[in-house]
Amino acid sequence: MTAAPPRVEQRTRANGIELAWDSFGDPAAEPLLLVMGLGAQMVAWDDAFCARLAEAGGHRVIRFDNRDIGHSTHLTLLGVPDIQALMAQAMAGLPLRAPYDLRDMAADCVGLLDALGIARAHIVGASM
């Protein structure tokens, strides 16, 4: 694969926060949203890989930084969750109290797509 040209990062307000994102390919092409897993920035989706998906698949490939990661909003006022305490609560069957959960992060994805005027998209995710 050849190296892709540098992308221009953009920021969009969605779901009450600011999300950093960029895209590859024709903006009018069928969208493909790349969602990175816990603790990793969007650049973990390699530029050349994204460009190849756009070229070979004919997609507009969109990648973004989740909340609290990279150049998206960092929710520092909510504090850092105590992972050990959360695991103990889960093992004890107690309700978890975290500043946000996967539903919020899924809403971030929908909010980004809405802000970009995208009604439907293919979604590809990478987990921990």
Language model region names:
Residues T2-E18:
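N-terminal cap/lid segment of alpha/beta-hydrolase-fold proteins
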Residues I17-M91:
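Conserved HGGG/HGGXW glycine-rich cap/lid loop of the alpha/beta-hydrolase fold
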Residues M105, S127-M128:
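Active-site loop->helix "elbow" adjoining a glycine-rich segment at hydrolase catalytic centers
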